[in-house]
Amino acid sequence: SQCQGKRSWPQLVGSTGAAAKAVIERENPRVRAVIVRVGSPVTADFRCDRVRVWVTERGIVARPPAIG
């Protein structure tokens, strides 16, 4: 793939969305982490500069964040 830098953060499952966003953007400055509530509609496009951080209604990371 053409995406550069760290690509996934499985260790962040169970963290708060805000903490996960900070870690992701620190570990790969090329990406912007976007917090999204599980079940929200999102676009299907793939982007190397985006990491979706899927959180529960309580703001806890529910899936391993990854570039996409």
UniProtKB/Swiss-Prot annotation:
It comes from the Eukaryota. The keyword Secreted does not apply. Disulfide bonds join 3-48. Transmembrane segments: none annotated. GO terms for biological process: response to wounding. Competitively inhibits Glu S.griseus protease by forming probably a 1:1 complex. BGIA has no inhibitory activity against 2 other acidic amino acid-specific endopeptidases (S.aureus protease V8 and B.subtilis proteinase), chymotrypsin, trypsin, pancreatic elastase, and papain, although subtilisin Carlsberg was strongly inhibited. Belongs to the protease inhibitor I13 (potato type I serine protease inhibitor) family. This is Glu S.griseus protease inhibitor. It comes from Momordica charantia (Bitter gourd). The lineage of its organism: Eukaryota, Viridiplantae, Streptophyta, Embryophyta, Tracheophyta.
